[in-house]
UniProtKB/Swiss-Prot annotation:
The gene is LTB. This is Lymphotoxin-beta. Its main location: membrane. Keywords: Cytokine, Glycoprotein, Membrane. GO terms for cellular component: extracellular space; membrane. GO terms for molecular function: cytokine activity; tumor necrosis factor receptor binding. GO terms for biological process: cell surface receptor signaling pathway; immune response; positive regulation of canonical NF-kappaB signal transduction; positive regulation of extrinsic apoptotic signaling pathway; positive regulation of interleukin-12 production. It is a single-pass type II membrane protein. InterPro entries: TNF, TNF_C, TNF_CS, TNF_dom, Tumour_necrosis_fac-like_dom. It is found in: Membrane. CDD domains: TNF.
């Protein structure tokens, strides 16, 4: 994954990314599955950020990071995508009590989830992320996929 001007981009041919058995990938439309079946869908998104400057209500520093996996197209038809799986994590960064930094220390977390979903040929699955500017796009930190299990 990498940051683009319009959000998060996904890689389909580099590093550990691969496609098999007729699966197709389009950055704009997601992962197109080649046949009807039961699929294990998974998503793992690494996030990182920096705590805000000291002062104010601690709850104002909290941020809820959402990662959602949707289905669209194929036999499902055009129209509103359907939410299949969702993961969330609320982060309340700890301020640096020594105030050595203008901003607080860096924080890291991840949101991972997976589940079994019955999908049909031509349906596409894609990920929507609430805070693309906080995604950790370094190698192995952010990925999603589908494995046909039945």
């Amino acid at each position: 994954a990498w940051i683009t001007g319009q959000g998060l981009g996904w890689e389909a041919k580099k590093e550990e990314a691969f496609l098999r058995s007729g699966t197709q990938f389009s950055g704009a439309e997601g992962l197109a599955l080649p046949q009807d079946g039961l699929y294990y869908l998974y998503c793992h998104v690494g996030y990182r950020g920096r705590a805000p400057p000291p002062g104010g209500d601690p709850l104002d520093r909290s941020v809820t990071l959402l990662s959602r996996l949707y289905r669209a197209g194929g036999a499902y038809g055009p129209g509103t995508p359907e939410l299949l799986l969702e993961g969330a994590e609320t982060v309340t960064p700890v301020l640096d009590p020594s105030r050595r930094h203008e901003y607080g220390p860096l924080w890291y977390t991840s949101v991972g989830f997976g589940g079994l979903v019955q999908l049909r040929r031509g349906e596409r699955v894609y990920v929507n992320i609430s805070h693309p500017d906080m995604v950790d796009y370094r190698r192995g930190k952010t990925f999603f996929g589908a494995v046909m299990v039945g």
